[in-house]
């Protein structure tokens, strides 16, 4: 394959070249190279249409990593692209979208880098000991040899190709279960074998074929490559691409990766509409939760913790409406009690769940006045105090996320989707009441564009009151008024079956298929690292038989999927901690925008972080007094004053 000089798009200002030609014509950085590299990745792609570019960017954005993108078809790659004027390497990880950076031109394929540019890149990797990870590549020796020979190749559709980690792969991807079967779908796959004359090590296999490899180069560079395509929407990407980046950076980067599962249940003490399999809805009396249902959920929660040790801290959040509570009830669990024993059983279970202020009577807060808004918030807190329910008053979830600029202009229309008028259309009297009562965090809804943060796992600072942060929830299709598998299945198919309101599936689904489809969506949230909670309702807690409920069926399914892939725990925070985490992410991304800089000094074993702007940034691979561990990884918040460097102990991964 001929090399051709093309270009690169990308990265930063240049200082004097730190790479130079040696007497034999090769490229070297040895004379100017230092033991220092920035905590920043370089994504090398062909152009904006490069299929691998969104996958790398999505992974890095989720982490909150610092990175640059070089588009090789339009901007030259020079030594100054890679090395600062003071000799510090600009990047601690080189991330290629493909091993050849090829694109079609004049009936053939050419590379975005010419021979000189490839040599400059390789010299930088060698002299600064920077690793290279390739999202997709194949066998062959051009532009360099990964020690792979062809076995077969072909497209994979929706039927998964099961791939397995080797012992070496399990060490690299140690956040995955060693026995995990990574499903490869919607992909083009090169099945390869490691040549017997090479020292390459298979990391991922499909049967006897290698589809992921660790391959040292002849000059000592470290390279890793997958031999199948992926995109940012596929589970295989969530499972593997972060691991490529983590390996390339040695676990030293700005940001962090964690996995969370949070579940809230709305309307405790309240009643719900009740949907029946024939499609009719009963509202009076509707569904009312019993003491047995409440006690049963406590047992199911404990059973799930025991069945799935990775979710050992799982605790449901109950968003309660205290207006229907019996304030004269005692404290007694009634495992087989009815509706009348719910409050006493709730008091008995006060420390079994987490409790969230959901307003006293669940009114829509879109146009309520100050006095009404204040009493709904404050009186519900008073009920919790009287019943002994621990509630943090800084968190508020309104009925149907009302008061935050999303509502139907016709107040009598409860069936059509609401209109998102934006957060500036929020009820100012409600906001004022919330502020005055010490509320800091308001639940939002990811279904509403105005509630979606601009950065991953962030919150939305309210434009009408910057002391308030909107932290969105994930909705689910486990319907708020369904209590049994038959009801949920009928409702789901009435929406998404071939004859539904929003046809999606070619045939109606069974209940097990509904749960599987819904937990595939939830699994994508978990595997991506999403912080946000999933929302359910009290009807989903009904014991429909043998202690089973719609919610715990959903939890059993999603935790089963997670546990089949991952070795690291799924984190479960209380709501104040969750909300504070989202606010800290806002601060982290503000630091990235301000130009925060981290530099790893290999000789000193330190990372030095500085920023032109005061604030806090999260650093992975850093050990401080506030550091936390997650699997084999460690990360820490680093608080910065403007222009004042902070040196911390580095803890790189192998």
Predicted feature residues:
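Secretory targeting and sorting signals
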Residues: 1-18
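Metal-dependent polysaccharide deacetylase catalytic core of the NodB/CE4 family, i.e.
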Residues: 39-42, 99, 119-120, 125-128, ...
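Helical hinge/lid and interdomain linker segments adjacent to catalytic or ligand-binding clefts
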Residues: 42-134, 140-142
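An acidic, glycine-rich "communication" segment
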Residues: 130-207
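Non-catalytic propeptide/linker segments at domain boundaries
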Residues: 190-269, 274-312, 319-320, 332-335
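Catalytic grooves of carbohydrate-active enzymes
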Residues: 229-231, 245-274, 475-572
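Carbohydrate-binding surface patches
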Residues: 595-629
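C-terminal beta-strand-rich structural cap/linker in extracellular carbohydrate-active enzymes
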Residues: 632-654
């Amino acid at each position: 394959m001929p090399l051709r000089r093309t270009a690169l798009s990308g990265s930063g200002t240049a200082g004097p070249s730190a790479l130079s030609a040696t007497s034999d014509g090769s490229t070297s950085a040895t004379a100017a190279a230092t033991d220092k590299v920035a905590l920043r990745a370089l994504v090398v792609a062909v152009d904006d249409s490069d299929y691998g570019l969104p996958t790398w960017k999505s992974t890095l954005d989720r982490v909150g990593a610092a990175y640059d993108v070089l588009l090789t078809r339009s901007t030259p790659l020079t030594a100054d692209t890679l090395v600062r004027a003071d000799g510090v390497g600009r990047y601690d990880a080189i991330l290629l979208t493909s091993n050849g950076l090829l694109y079609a031109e004049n009936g053939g394929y050419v590379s975005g880098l010419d021979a000189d540019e490839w040599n400059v890149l390789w010299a930088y990797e060698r002299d600064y000991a920077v690793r290279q990870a390739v999202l997709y590549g194949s066998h062959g020796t051009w532009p360099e040899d990964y020690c792979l020979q062809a076995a077969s190749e072909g497209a994979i559709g929706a039927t998964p190709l099961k791939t397995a980690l080797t012992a070496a792969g399990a060490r690299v991807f140690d956040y995955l279960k060693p026995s995990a079967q990574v499903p490869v779908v919607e992909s083009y796959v090169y099945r390869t074998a490691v040549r017997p004359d090479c020292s390459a090590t298979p990391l991922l296999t499909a049967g006897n074929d290698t589809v992921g490899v660790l391959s040292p180069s002849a000059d000592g560079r470290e390279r890793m490559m997958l031999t199948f395509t992926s995109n940012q929407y596929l589970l295989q990407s969530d499972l593997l691409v972060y691991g490529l980046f983590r390996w390339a950076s040695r676990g030293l980067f700005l940001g962090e990766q964690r996995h969370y599962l949070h579940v809230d249940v709305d309307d405790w003490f309240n009643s719900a509409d009740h949907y029946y399999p024939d499609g009719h809805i009963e509202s009076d009396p509707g569904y009312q939760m019993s003491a047995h249902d409440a006690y049963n959920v406590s047992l199911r929660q404990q059973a799930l913790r025991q069945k799935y040790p990775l979710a050992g801290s799982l605790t449901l959040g109950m968003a309660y409406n205290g207006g229907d509570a019996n304030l004269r009830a005692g404290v007694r669990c009634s495992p087989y009690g009815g509706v009348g024993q719910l409050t006493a059983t709730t008091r008995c279970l006060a420390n079994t769940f987490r409790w969230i202020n959901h307003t006293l009577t669940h009114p829509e807060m879109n146009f309520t006045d100050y006095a009404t808004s204040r009493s709904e918030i404050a009186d519900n807190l008073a009920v919790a105090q009287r019943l002994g329910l621990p509630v943090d008053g800084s968190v508020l979830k309104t009925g149907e996320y009302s008061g935050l600029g999303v509502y139907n202009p016709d107040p009598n229309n409860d069936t059509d989707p609401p209109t998102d008028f934006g957060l500036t259309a929020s009820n100012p009297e409600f906001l004022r009441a919330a502020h005055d009562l010490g509320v800091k965090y308001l639940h939002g809804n990811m279904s509403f564009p105005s509630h979606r943060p601009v950065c991953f796992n962030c919150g939305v600072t309210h434009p009408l009151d910057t002391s308030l942060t909107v932290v969105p929830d994930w909705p689910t299709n486990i319907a708020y008024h369904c209590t049994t598998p038959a009801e949920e299945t009928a409702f789901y198919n009435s929406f998404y079956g071939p004859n539904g309101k929003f046809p999606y599936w070619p045939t109606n689904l069974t209940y097990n298929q509904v749960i599987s489809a819904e937990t595939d969506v939830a699994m994508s949230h978990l595997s991506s690292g999403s912080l946000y909670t999933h929302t359910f309702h009290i009807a989903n807690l009904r014991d429909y038989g043998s202690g089973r409920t719609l919610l715990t069926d959903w939890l059993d399914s999603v935790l089963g999927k997670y546990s089949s892939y991952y070795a690291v725990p799924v984190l479960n925070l209380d709501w104040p901690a969750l909300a504070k985490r989202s606010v800290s992410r806002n601060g982290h991304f503000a630091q990235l925008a301000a130009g925060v800089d981290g530099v790893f000094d290999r000789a000193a074993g330190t990372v030095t972080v500085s920023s032109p702007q005061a604030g806090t940034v999260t650093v992975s691979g850093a050990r401080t007094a506030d550091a936390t561990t997650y699997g084999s990884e460690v990360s820490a918040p680093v608080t910065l004053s403007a222009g004042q460097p902070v040196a911390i102990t580095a803890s790189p991964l192998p």
